[in-house]
From Swiss-Prot:
Protein name, entry field: GTPase Obg
Binding partners and assembly: Monomer.
GO biological processes: ribosome biogenesis
Gene name for this UniProt entry: obg
Domain of life of the source: Bacteria
Gene3D superfamilies: GTP-binding protein OBG, C-terminal domain, GTP1/OBG domain, P-loop containing nucleotide triphosphate hydrolases
Disordered: region residues: 529-563
Enzyme class: hydrolase
């Protein structure tokens, strides 16, 4: 079996993010030290990198499932989890990455192009790792001082991609089977393709590096084409993708064939017809030269055979009338190879300069579109004259007449994945975030009522719940007592006199309040003394005062006071 594979489907998955920690600091003499849970580590990503040492996609055929490392969970004592290791996957230069489309369990076909890894070191992140969950120390603020929950890590991105290798060569050799393409590449370079005297010996493309003086260029041997290849005959047009990047197309024509109804001119036109059919279905990148407009040369092979030599001399003027350069060669005797080599080198040099100028012009004319800045302001509804919401709410109806509301958006779906639904406080925090984002207001605007079913997310990550808009974002009543806002520990409240540590300003204010209260009491007592309600023996005299409660009138024998 050949070790050359130029198309594979790969299932990639980024690493999951680690969960945050909901740790509480415990230290001697500090019973209320607060939260200290660290954040979870981010998951690793799957990255394809163009590597000149890679020559085939064979490894991905036998190992199509690739998963990056996951992040670890956060720990107490403010320790964050470690990041998952990125998975670096080398691919040959010239590999194109496509999004795989198709039904589950069936063969996938290429969709949108994700990357074109043409040059050494080109990188493409195809599966992003999940973000690590925040620990409770990161969730704490002045109103939520001791969160009893942490956020879960996000799942890594998971998808199918198709890798398609398109050989990067300067010259592509096309021709009928047994025209001598493999023999030509073996004679001009150090490549050692399989050579035999039967059709379709070459089943995979072969690349060879040719040296001409101080310059070098590459040639690609494309498996043989026959009329009807666009309809699937022979090897079809499967391998013609390898000529998409070549700037020069060289027709190798067998002048010694004994097959009926074949001659050099008919072979040339038959191959051009197949190339045209392939070019009609091809979507080239911006600025690329269409295949019918690329320069062509004609190589008349096997002139070491006398009859072939005569035929080559006969048809040469016909090709020159079409504006084509014609070379008569023999791969067996190496006749004409030197002239062909230097002619191809000069043509390659000319095309490289043209390509460089074209790429520079495209770079100067490129339009850069920058995304709108969304930082700082809360998005408004489109009908309010602002930007669109960061989510959408749609009213859906099932076949049985039941109605539910579907919430879609990056933030709501991400928040749902981060929530631990076994923790009531975490669920409440999610409700606060959704309300602050405007989901509840949008649900009301769409006609939702308490108890209606609401769905957030899609697929296996979807969450269903009955909408209850009565929970306030500031505080809620649990067990009949006001426990304050979610994540608030009343032991840490500033108004708690048992543990509150007063500042110097508070001490001075309390001292002045105490002194003012004492002065007010003294003034009230002095007013009562002056009114005669009481007397101070050390200050007041012993004179009889009828109005005094402490008068010194003489008492009678029967105990009555003498007037």
């Amino acid at each position: 079996m050949s070790d050359f594979v130029d198309r594979v489907t790969v299932h990639v998955k980024g690493g999951d993010g680690g969960n945050g920690s909901a740790g509480i600091r415990r230290e001697k003499y500090k019973p209320l030290a607060g939260p200290n849970g660290g954040n979870g580590g981010d998951g690793g990503s799957v990255v394809f990198v163009a590597d000149r040492n890679a020559t085939s996609l064979l490894d991905y055929r036998f190992m199509p499932h690739r998963v990056a490392g996951s992040g670890t969970m956060g720990l107490g004592d403010n320790k964050d989890g470690s990041k998952g290791e990125d998975l670096i996957l080398p691919v040959p230069c010239g590999t194109v990455v496509f999004e795989a489309r198709g039904e589950q369990g069936k063969a996938k076909h290429p969709g949108a192009q994700l990357a074109d890894l043409r040059h050494e070191g080109d990188r493409c992140v195809v599966a992003q790792g999940g973000a690590g969950g925040l620990g409770n120390i990161a969730l704490a603020n002045k109103t939520r001082r001791a969160p009893g929950f942490a956020l879960l890590g996000e799942l890594g991105e998971e998808r199918d991609v198709i890798l398609e290798l398109k050989s990067i060569a300067d010259v592509a050799l096309v021709g009928f089977p047994s025209a001598g393409k493999s023999s030509l590449i073996a004679a001009m370079s150090s490549a050692k393709p399989k050579i035999a005297d039967y059709p379709f010996t070459t089943l995979v493309p072969n690349l060879g590096v040719v040296i001409a003086g101080d310059s070098r260029y590459t040639i690609a041997d494309v498996p043989g084409l026959i009329p009807g290849a666009s309809e699937g005959k022979g090897l079809g047009l499967e391998f013609l993708r390898h000529i998409e990047r070549t700037e020069i197309i060289a027709h190798v024509i067998d002048c010694a064939t004994l097959e009926p109804d074949r001659d050099p001119m008919s072979d040339y036109h038959a191959l051009e017809n197949e190339l045209a059919l392939y070019a009609d279905k091809l979507e080239l990148p911006l600025g690329a030269i269409p295949i019918p407009e690329r320069p062509r040369i004609v190589i008349l092979n096997k002139i070491d055979v006398p009859e072939a030599k005569e035929l080559a001399e006969f048809v040469r003027p016909e090709f020159e009338k079409l504006g084509l350069k014609v070379f008569e060669i023999s791969t067996a005797s190496h006749e004409g190879l030197k002239e062909l080599n230097f002619a191809l080198s000069a043509l390659v040099h000319e095309m490289r300069e043209e390509v460089a100028n074209r790429e520079q012009a495209e770079e100067e004319a490129r339009v850069v579109i920058k995304p709108l800045e969304t930082k700082g302001r809360r998005p408004r509804r489109a009908d309010e004259g602002g930007s669109a919401l960061e989510f959408t709410v749609e009213r859906r109806e099932l076949g049985n007449g039941e109605v539910f509301f579907e919430v879609r958006g990056v933030k709501p779906e991400r928040w749902v994945m981060q929530t631990n639904f076994d923790n009531d406080e975490a669920v409440g925090y999610l409700a606060d975030r959704l309300a602050k984002l405007g989901v509840e207001d949008e649900l009301r605007r769409k006609g939702a009522h308490p108890g209606d079913e609401v769905r957030i997310g899609r697929g296996a990550r979807m969450v269903e719940f009955d909408w209850d808009p009565t929970i306030s974002a500031g505080a809620e009543m649990l067990d009949g007592s006001n426990l304050g806002a979610r994540g608030k520990d009343l032991r840490l409240e500033e108004l708690d006199p048992r543990t509150h540590r007063r500042s110097n300003a508070e001490r001075r204010a309390q001292y002045h309040e105490m002194m003012d209260a004492r002065a007010a009491v003294r003034d009230a007592m002095m007013a009562e003394r002056k009114a005669g309600h009481w007397a101070d023996p050390t200050v007041d005299d012993d004179r009889h005062d009828e109005t005094s409660l402490f008068g010194h009138g003489e008492s009678s024998e029967d105990g009555e006071t003498e007037e």
